[in-house]
Amino acid sequence: MKNISFKVNDFQYTINNKLTLIQACLKNKVDISRFCFHEKLSIAGNCRMCLVEDLKQVKPLASCAINVSNSMNIYTNTLKVKKARESVLEFLLANHPLDCPICDQGGECDLQDQSVVFGSDRGRFYEFKRSVEDKDCGPLIKTIMNRCIHCTRCVRFSNEVAGVNILGVTGRGSKMEIGFYIENLMRSELSGNVIDLCPVGALTSKPFAFTSRPWELKSYNSIDVLDSLHSNIRVDIRGTKIMRILPRVNSELNEDWITDKIRFSYDSFRRQRLYDPMVKISGSFLKIGWKKAMLFIKKFFCNFLGFNHSSFIPLRGYIGDYLDLETIYTFKKFLLLNGSNFFLPSSSYNDLTALYSFNTPLTRLDEGDFCILLDVNLRVELPIVNSRIKQLVSKKMLPVFVLGFYSNFNYFVKHISNSSKTLLHVLEGSHWLSAKISKKFSSKPIFLIGDSSSLLKGSLIVPLFNFTNVICDNWNGLNIISNDSSYLSTKEFNLSSSHSQNSHLLNFPINFVLNYDKAVLVDSSAFQIYQGHHGDTNAINSNLIFPSTSFIEKNSFYSNSLAIVQKTKKILFSPGNSRDDWKILNALIDNFGFSYFKVRNSFDLVSFLSESTPFILYKRSFSFKCFGFYEQLVYHFFNYFSVNNNYYIYDSITRNSKIMSLCFNKFKMKGYNFF
């Protein structure tokens, strides 16, 4: 790859010749004003705000559309450039409304900022300003199309990243406008990102409208635990209230995007929260303090042991989503100290991390030459990864085949079958797809597999590794997809986040439900303890409730599906008398007199964690192990069924979000089943 030298403002730079001029300047910290250009979108060249002067050219050049050439001499701050930008701004402002004081983009508006620097002090436009009808994009995006400057960022994002080809440009001249070709809604799980992309106030957040100004907000960095990727986010608060959630750039994970679920579900952190420990007496809940709650549970356990003449407590745990590593580790210790044995059977291959993690770095997905989706609805479970696959299909014509339930994909796929028996035929070489994924024809295949797939039970693991190059030198294309944010963490500690594999233990007399929001099928006579942050069905059916904090109210470590450990920050104070999950469990351990597990603060707990799980301190390198020593199990054939299609209302957080409920009802009313 050839490097060339060029000059910008009389400073010499060396850069790759495949870059455009604006990309080369941005890489070398030379700022060039722009509206339509964005690093993650294709080049449009609409706004002409990025004009620069080349001494070899008569007219200014659009730096976003010109590749760097050798010995190029560019100036970005000459009088000619400034006059050109002033003229461009004059045309943009000619039809722009003068409603800046009531615009939600105020303080973050690129048009305002660049008008101050490059704009004129007067206007020469005396005609009527044009008027454009606002579009209905749904309950998330507010449109005021009079402010639109036709940068087409939203159009390119919807087509190239979100994969919904519903936005476009119609008309010419003064009648040109951006909108839907037919009346439609922005039906994408990434639609909120157009709010960040819009350089003016044409597209703004509808829930955030008229609530606060950017300079009134305090910003904190955190992560999105509502899916297993853990995208990087920025949480803006005012006082004790979350006002909005925005993305943070992370090229290894979410790039510049986040999902609508984390962006708009922030209102749920103030609704249906559990504030105090409660005990159920005669069918009604009574508030009690933490001391009384600990005394109650200790007395109950002592009475149970004495009545049943038992030396251990038959306690069964249910582990839910959104649990941090400290909580999972402490919960495992709590179960062990009470004599419980709630671990996965060895047939699930829990001793190999590669069999329950996302092994291919997202930055290397473009190296894949083939992709198979097995029993997974990628658009619902990991929308960011789905967006990356969509871009590979568009740019590299990546072939994608689906084995499992067919959902509404936003890119071209070939659906093979609903039966798991077809996968066996493929791996045996008797199917037409066998030739395409064999070691001879595919050097770097990508397998995206749902966590409920039969493949994970071991029956087809060995044929997969023997027939394909899914794991070879310098490549691991085996990727497990899960809706559960703490899926990998529970596997690392050899715990199950699902009760289905232990259905024969339904008659346990005591159940401990740890932030588990799915239905718990237990005997009505069983004593149930619920620990969580939102009041849900399992809380109502419990005998004792411990209120805990959510991820925005504590400093905790979380591991995503790629085994990348990140930390959340305590942004808000915990409501009422709620406590961190691990602190509640640690208090229970102390309450039962287990003195040999002493944890007094988070630093002690991190020390325990680093000893038991090395990937806490050291980023896990991807190992390419030999799986040949595993015995092949008996085949079990069945048809794949649809996984959860309700993207907006899935868990205790989104179920308590008014905004998510509006989204669900709006799309349901319109009859959209786009997942």
UniProtKB/Swiss-Prot annotation:
Binding residue positions for [2Fe-2S] cluster: C36, C47, C50, C64
EC number: 7.1.1.2
Domain 4Fe-4S His(Cys)3-ligated-type: 80-119
Alphabetized InterPro entries for the sequence: 2Fe-2S_ferredoxin-like_sf (IPR036010), 2Fe-2S_ferredoxin-type (IPR001041), Mopterin_OxRdtase (IPR006656), Mopterin_OxRdtase_4Fe-4S_dom (IPR006963), NADH_UbQ_OxRdtase_75kDa_su_CS (IPR000283), NADH_UbQ_OxRdtase_ferredoxin (IPR054351), NADH_UbQ_OxRdtase_Gsu (IPR010228), NADH_UbQ_OxRdtase_Gsu_4Fe4S-bd (IPR019574)
UniProt keyword list: 2Fe-2S, 4Fe-4S, Electron transport, Iron, Iron-sulfur, Membrane, Metal-binding, Mitochondrion, Mitochondrion inner membrane, NAD, Oxidoreductase, Respiratory chain, Translocase, Transport, Ubiquinone
The reaction(s) this protein catalyses: a ubiquinone + NADH + 5 H(+)(in) = a ubiquinol + NAD(+) + 4 H(+)(out)
Residues annotated to bind [4Fe-4S] cluster 1: H96, C100, C103, C109
CDD domains hit by this protein: fer2 (cd00207), MopB_Res-Cmplx1_Nad11-M (cd02774)
Signal peptide: none
Subunit composition and interactions: Complex I is composed of about 30 different subunits.
Family, as annotated: Belongs to the complex I 75 kDa subunit family.
The protein's name: NADH-ubiquinone oxidoreductase 75 kDa subunit
Source organism of this protein record: Acanthamoeba castellanii (Amoeba)
Gene it is expressed from: NAD11
